[in-house]
Amino acid sequence: MADTVLFEFLHTEMVAELWAHDPDPGPGGQKMSLSVLEGMGFRVGQALGERLPRETLAFREELDVLKFLCKDLWVAVFQKQMDSLRTNHQGTYVLQDNSFPLLLPMASGLQYLEEAPKFLAFTCGLLRGALYTLGIESVVTASVAALPVCKFQVVIPKS
């Protein structure tokens, strides 16, 4: 329980610090801050991707890796499993969390939807870093239609 609170507090402070110097950054400044958060998440995802699958058998398919992310990685970071995983079986996966912990503290009003991307960049990097460590290049994006529901889209280009 304490580690969850500490992680959420640390994440909130990282976001606040990156936006503190310029509360209303232009598109370039906001893009840079999102990139920094995504980079931090990528490095954490790499470390977790190395450490967590030690007890797991080798992954046979991409889908097995994504199931690992939805179950084991999500539990390790957020103490809950991802709510759903969907795929088109062509390299696109949609992971949905109906009560994403980093968005729960935000009010559910529409005015807060524009603030949501800065609270999702770290997690996009986390997923991309874990996938990279497990041998899968990917592009991860996030979207929020209604708080605190969040969808992460993972696109794995076919080589």
From Swiss-Prot:
Gene Ontology BP annotations: COPII vesicle coating; endoplasmic reticulum to Golgi vesicle-mediated transport; vesicle tethering
Q: Which UniProt keywords apply?
A: Endoplasmic reticulum, ER-Golgi transport, Golgi apparatus, Phosphoprotein, Transport
Q: Which domain of life is it from?
A: Eukaryota
Give the InterPro entries listed for this entry. Answer: NO_sig/Golgi_transp_ligand-bd (IPR024096), TRAPP_component (IPR007194), TRAPPC6/Trs33 (IPR037992)
List, alphabetically, the GO terms of the cellular component aspect. cis-Golgi network; cytoplasm; cytosol; endoplasmic reticulum; trans-Golgi network; TRAPP complex; TRAPPIII protein complex
Which positions does the record annotate as the modified residue Phosphoserine?
A: S33
Cellular compartments annotated:
Golgi apparatus, cis-Golgi network; Endoplasmic reticulum
Name the family.
Belongs to the TRAPP small subunits family. BET3 subfamily.
Q: What does this protein do?
A: May play a role in vesicular transport during the biogenesis of melanosomes.
> Whom does it interact with, and what assembly results?
Part of the multisubunit transport protein particle (TRAPP) complex. Heterodimer with TRAPPC3. The heterodimer TRAPPC3-TRAPPC6A interacts with TRAPPC2L. Interacts with TRAPPC2L.
Q: Which PANTHER family match?
A: TRAFFICKING PROTEIN PARTICLE COMPLEX SUBUNIT 6A (PTHR12817:SF2), TRAFFICKING PROTEIN PARTICLE COMPLEX SUBUNIT 6B (PTHR12817)
Q: What is this protein called?
A: Trafficking protein particle complex subunit 6A
Q: Which organism is this entry from?
A: Homo sapiens (Human)
The gene is TRAPPC6A
